[in-house]
Regions:
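Alpha-helix N-cap and loop-to-helix initiation/capping positions
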Residues: 52-59, 84-91, 119-127
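Structural preference for beta-strand elements that scaffold enzyme active sites
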Residues: 15, 36-38, 73-75, 103, ...
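Conserved radical SAM core fold
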Residues: 21-26, 35-57, 73-75, 79-83, ...
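Single conserved hydrophobic/aromatic residue that forms the stacking wall/gate
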Residues: 1-13
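Catalytic cores of alpha/beta
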Residues: 22-29, 83-95, 152-163
Length: 201
């Protein structure tokens, strides 16, 4: 059984459900009507071995290439705050550009007690906004959205993300943390003079 959801006009499969994707699996998904596959690269290739021990960066590339071979559009981004350097954030952006990714969720680590990254130093709101702006310069045509952790890390500067390079926002709850109310986010978007559109990935 495949867990999937309809988002806008696209059926989306998330990699937390399917993990590493073979070429045959990718073509099966395409055959049943899936149009987009989600698989974050998480961080820069040079930093990946420092944050993940269950699979390799090449496993990520294997999955993304197979999805693309089958004609699936790939949604891929990562997390800021994994003790990466500013240079590695730029490296990550160029890697997404190289892969031809047009849908980029950018999460912000929320350190949680008892986890391996509990003691990580969080980025300041201005560091995050600078990183967002850099991603926009490197990926000028991509849908780049702020996602998990924005409430905790950006705090009162959340709205500036949408005026500083990003053109999307993920609302509601996330994988491990809750978000703020949908009504509050809609009001923020309205206050910026923007409109809420059909959700896309």
């Amino acid at each position: 059984e495949i867990s999937c959801s309809l988002v806008g006009s696209e059926m989306c499969i998330r990699d937390r459900s399917l993990g590493i994707l073979t070429e045959a699996q990718a073509f099966e998904l395409k055959k049943i009507g899936v149009t987009r596959y989600h698989s974050n690269i998480e961080t820069a290739p040079s930093h990946f071995p420092d944050i993940c021990s269950t699979h390799t960066y090449e496993d990520k590339m294997f999955t993304i290439r197979n999805a693309q071979k089958a004609g699936l559009r790939v949604c891929s981004g990562g997390i800021f705050g994994l003790n990466e350097t500013a240079k590695q954030r730029v490296e990550m952006a160029f890697e997404l550009k190289r892969l031809g990714i047009d849908s980029v969720p950018l999460n912000l680590l929320t350190p949680i007690p008892g986890t391996p990254f509990a003691d990580n130093k969080t980025l300041t709101p201005l560091e995050i906004l600078r990183a967002y702006a850099v991603f926009r310069f490197i990926l000028p045509k991509a849908l780049i959205r702020t996602a998990g952790g924005r409430e905790v890390n950006l705090r009162d500067l959340q709205a500036l993300a949408l005026n500083g390079g990003l053109n999307g926002i993920m609302i509601g709850g996330y994988l491990t943390t809750g978000g703020r109310s949908t009504d509050a986010d809609k009001q923020m978007i309205k206050d910026l003079g923007r409109k809420v559109t059909v959700p896309v990935l």
